[in-house]
Amino acid sequence: DTKISYPEINSGAKQTEALAAGSLDICSALGGTSAILAASNGVDLKIVGIYSRAPKAFTIMAKDPNITTVSDLTGKKVAGPKGTILHQILVAALAKNNLKPYSVELLSMDIPPSVNAMLNGNVDAALVAGSDVLRAQKAGAHIIISGEGLVDATIVIAARGDLVKNNPDILKRYLSAHRKNIDYMNQEQAKAYDFTAQATGLAPEDVVTMAPWYDFDPEI
């Protein structure tokens, strides 16, 4: 039997640090941008599958009603995690509006504190993804733009190169279990939504709202 532990690490940078240190074997949901940055910095990781593609789930948000377009962000403070899909969306959105990355002041912080900083008025906008989008909307913030049409927003499944090379059977078993999970989600949608709500603490209606944002096809 194989003993499995499942640490909850939400930061892409911390996931790849754990891979590099050998304390983590598989990242079940790693931002594609984080994977590329880690590999370019010498981390021995291999992309073995796709967790999701979800451009609608990654957004730039503001609470100030006067900030409604990307151009309105010029000279403003934006909070969010650097070196991530969200950062990539910000740069792409600015470029699409003929603006440079330095047109805004990006303050690097994780998503929940970024949302809090925006809601408290400490920054003008925030890079927000997943359930935090709904949290921010319920607190009066609005979406300026999502990643749709800008990036694929691909979340990958990545593994340590050593695991791929020396323990391929373990990886095959993991990917088989992942595919079975996807099949269950598709076949038993109501049960899958209920389980997700219980596991995450999200309201059932929020799970239903967010589900269409994600494409969980695991094929690369």
What name fits each language-model region?
Residues D1-K100, E105-D110, D124-G130, H142-V151:
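Short, glycine-/small- and polar/acidic-enriched structural segments
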Residues Q15, S34, T69, L86, ...:
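Stable alpha-helical elements in mature extracytoplasmic
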Residues F58-I67, T154-D169:
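A bilobed periplasmic-binding-protein/Venus flytrap-type ligand-binding module shared by bacterial periplasmic
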Residues A136:
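Short helix- or helix-capping micro-motifs
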Residues N166-I220:
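Secondary-structure end/capping motifs
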